[in-house]
Every structure is written in C-alpha cells, then in structure tokens.
A protein has these predicted regions:
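Beta-strand->loop->alpha-helix junctions that form or flank phosphate-binding loops
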Residues: 45-46, 64-67, 103-109, 148-151, ...
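Histidine-centered active-site/metal-ligand motif
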Residues: 19, 67, 125-126, 196, ...
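Short, surface-exposed amphipathic charged segments that create phosphate/polyanion-binding patches used
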Residues: 76-81, 116-121, 163-164, 254-268
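Phosphate-binding loop of NTP-binding sites
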Residues: 9, 34-37, 57, 71, ...
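Generic structural signal for helix capping and beta-alpha/helix-loop junctions
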Residues: 52, 73, 111, 155-156, ...
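Nucleotide phosphate-binding/pyrophosphate-handling subdomain across enzymes
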Residues: 3-19, 27, 31-38, 115, ...
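N-terminal leader/targeting and accessory segments in enzymes
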Residues: 1-103, 107, 222, 256-258, ...
C-alpha cells in the first residue's frame, strides 16, 4: 500500500476534485456530502445502484457504477474504503498516474479538525447505540451536529447527518487502528475486549491501540472511560490526561446511575455527576448494558456543557438504532428482533 506524502488537509478546499471509490458505503456517502459542502467537486464509483447512489446524484455528484480507471477522469485525489485494495483498477490507475490515494479514516480525521468539538465513541461493543444516543441528546440541545454512525438511526432515516454546528459526533472503530487517524477532542471508551484478532495480536495489543487513541486528545479535551470495564481501565492506565469515568453504581466515578428501576426490561434512573443530579433518564431499549451506554453519552454531553434537560429529552425520544436489538414485530405470539450480532 502506498502512503501519500501530501497531507490530505491540503486538498480540503473549494474547487479540488475528489474521487470516492465505494462512494455508496455507509461512511462514504456522508463523507461525500461533507466534502461537497466544503466546496470540493465530488465524484465517485460503486459496484451497484442503490438509494444512496441516487441520493448522491440528486445533489449533483457524478457516480459511476463499476470500478474502472476511466472513472478517475481528472481528479486530484482518491479516497477509498478499507474494502478496496491496491489491485482495484481505480486504485491501481491512480497510483500509476501519481494521484494520491487516501483511506476513508484519514479523510474523516482531516474533516474533524474543522470542528470545535470532535466527539468519538469507541469500544468493542455499544458504539452504534451510544453514538445514536449522543446524536439524540445533541439534537435535543439544538446543537445541530454533524454525525457519522455505523448503522441506521430512525430519527435521521440514515446513519449520518451534515449539520452546521461546531460539533461532529463519530462512531470510531479500532479495526486496523483506523481511529488513530482521528483528532478527537472528546474520546469515549465504552469497553475493551478481544475482537478483530485477524489484525490485533491479543488483548494487550487491543488495549494499547485504545490507549493510543485516548492519547490523541489535546489538553483542552476530555477522555471518558468505563470504570466498570477492566479492558477500558487498562487502556487508560498511565495516561497523562485526566480521565472522566462513568459507572453503573460506583459512586467514586465522575458519573454514575442512581435509583435504577426496570419497567418491562427498560431502565429508569438518575444520572449523577460529581454527586449531583444531572438528568433523569427513562430508556425505551432494554438491558443493563444500555444504562452504561446512556451514561457514556450523558458524560460526553456534560463535559461539553449540554444541559441535563437535553439528555432527558433526547433519550426519551430514543428507541434504538437499526439492527441493534431492533424490535420488528411478532410472529405467532413470539417477539421478533433484528440484531447485527457480529461478535
């Protein structure tokens, strides 16, 4: 794999022509829209027609179906998904012509530097749900965030939105160390466990990656971590940066849940921060783990000055993300759920 010698930030200006290989992907489509909003001329390719492709074309983005070096035209740079390798005709063509090729994560990392607040949710489990919760909270606060989620959020009818506020919220994946291309001002670690062992050597290697991710946060920013998770505790151990912690019941944590009660499997509780009531939450998704997810989202809101009322309202309206224990209906009296369940 060739690594461009020119910083991708050099290209993020009006009039530059960017080609996105795999433009219909879940995190490439919002990337295309953000780049378009920055004044770049955006084009791309994908293997199949889709609603996403039609949506991009409706905004004036030229999308070719199928991959060919001819699709590059006179582009200035190429951005690709992790699934597209050097042997792809567009990537090979770009390399042959000396056109710089960047990874999707590099592009997002450069973009987030244009925002005052870059809130990155990481972890082995719960990223999509917690990023979705945070989106609801920041929307309730009328912060108008830009959002990138690795799943569909019913409120958005998509996995992303392009806002005009000073905050960007991203689901941040550790696979291939992609989140190390990011520039978080708020780095949230939900949990750390064994996963992606086709890339990482072992759990210690994964913890080291999360430690490096947290270490990216500037001194003005915040590292938020799950005090109840051993892997997360190991990941933030030894950081020079202070760590804001959340916990289900540990009252020595910065943020914890009080007076937890369950109704039909869904939790109701108070969010306590530094011993003071910050917000009351009534969840509409089941499971104790979602209390922790809500505490993580609330912690991110708190450190950025979002009022507790927005946490209450935002989570009151949250009924889950697509394919995350998503209730689809019933069949002969049995409840039917759709869950990604890829671990």
């Amino acid at each position: 794999m060739m690594h461009p010698t020119i910083d991708i930030k050099t290209f993020l200006k009006p009039g530059v022509r960017a080609h996105l290989a795999g433009i219909g992907g879940v995190s490439m489509c919002p990337l295309a829209e953000v780049l378009l909003g920055m004044g770049l001329i955006v084009q791309g390719s994908d293997m199949t027609e889709s609603d996403t492709v039609c949506q991009l074309r409706a905004q004036g983005i030229d999308v070719a179906i199928g991959h060919s070096a001819e699709n590059l035209k006179d582009c200035d740079l190429v951005i690709r998904t992790a699934a597209i390798h050097d042997e792809n005709p567009e990537i090979a063509g770009a390399i042959a012509r000396g056109i710089p090729v960047y990874e999707r994560a590099q592009a997002w990392g450069a973009i987030m530097q244009h925002y005052e607040n870059a809130v990155c949710f990481s972890g082995t489990h719960g990223k999509t749900t917690t990023t979705s919760m945070a989106t609801h909270i920041f929307m309730a606060a009328q912060a108008d965030p830009t959002v990138m989620i690795g799943g569909t959020l019913p409120m958005l009818h998509a996995g992303y939105r392009v806002g005009k506020g000073d905050t960007i919220i991203l689901e941040s994946c550790e696979y291939c160390n992609s989140f190390l291309n990011f520039f978080p001002t708020v780095a949230v670690i939900l949990n750390v466990g064994e996963d992606h062992l086709d890339f990482f050597k072992d759990l210690k290697d994964i913890e080291h990656s999360f430690h490096a991710f947290a270490d990216l946060v500037p001194q003005r920013g915040y590292v938020i971590s799950n005090a109840d998770d051993q892997g997360a505790r190991e990941a933030v151990a030894g950081l020079s940066h202070p760590v804001f912690t959340f916990s289900l019941a540990d009252r020595t944590a910065d943020c914890y849940a009080r007076d937890v009660a369950f109704f039909d499997g869904c939790a109701s509780f108070d969010v306590m921060i530094h011993g003071q009531l910050y917000a009351h939450v009534d969840l509409h998704i089941p499971g104790k783990h979602n209390i922790l997810n809500a505490l993580a989202a609330a912690s991110a809101a708190y450190v950025l000055g979002i009022p507790g009322q927005a946490v209450t309202r935002g989570l009151e309206d949250f009924h889950g993300a697509g394919r995350r224990f998503e209730h689809k209906g019933s069949y002969h009296g049995a409840a039917v759920y759709d869950d990604y369940a890829h671990h």
